[in-house]
Amino acid sequence: DKSNHHKYDWYVFNSHWTFEKFRMMFGLPAEKCLVIKNGIDKIQKAKPYKQGDPIRIIHQNTPWRGLSVLLGAMQLVKNPLITLDVYSSCEVYGKQFFDQNDHEYTELYEQARKLPNVNYIGYKPNSFIKSNMHKYNMYAYPSIFEETSCISLLECMAGGLYSITTNLGALFETGAEFPMYIPFDNDLRRLSMKFASAIEASANILHEETIHKHLETQSNYVNAYYNWNKIGTSWTRFLTGAI
């Protein structure tokens, strides 16, 4: 309701994609809008992949955002070097949310447990994920959810993981030019097939020097622009002027 705009001094968004959506949908006054992006901690980088080594993929997103698509893709992946670790659960939002919602995804978790190239691990705190990220080579997120940003993508990019995701929502802004983007498809079976092909293709080039340089540049980019010193400074400058 545009008549309520005078009640607010500022609207702060975590991506330009989100700002544009709200501006167009609700007629927000642009002079009251600001984008300050999410920040991440320093993360230990993965070592460059050597050809012939096991290829470990991480997926640490909530189950309704694309896990079914990823499990469908893993059924089609034939490279014996590839395994996927799934840290997906409703527990990330607390016990009450877990108790009310996690049962809806029991069959999906069971499917993950039965696949030979998938390890279903379930919930682990973010501190565990970040401290173990250097053990992985790739991050796969076939998002069917319009993200306003994506901290898990940023963390994996900072950690030097080759990332594959869709171009839905603000993911293309968050990832910039670094991930492999799979065009979103409402046909989720077809999206699974595309993701399987992307995983196989990515696995075949992980050892190449150009990919190693790409991931080094990627990590430096994220650490330069999404570190908490930079983001914190943006908040401090904004709040100093706003207050």
Regions found by a protein language model. Name each.
Residues 98-124:
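Nucleotide-activated donor-binding/catalytic signature segment of Leloir-type glycosyltransferases, i.e.
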Residues 17-18, 35-45, 90-93:
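Short beta-strand->alpha-helix junction loop in the catalytic core
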Residues 12, 49-66, 71-75, 85:
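Conserved donor-binding/catalytic core segment of Leloir-type glycosyltransferases
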Residues 1, 7-33, 40:
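A short, active-site helix/loop in glycosyltransferases that binds the activated sugar's phosphate group
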Residues 134-148, 161:
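Acidic donor-binding loop of glycosyltransferase active sites
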Residues 186, 207-240:
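A charged, aromatic-enriched C-terminal amphipathic alpha-helix characteristic of glycosyltransferases
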Residues 162-165, 172:
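Short hydrophobic beta-strand element within catalytic cores of glycosyltransferases
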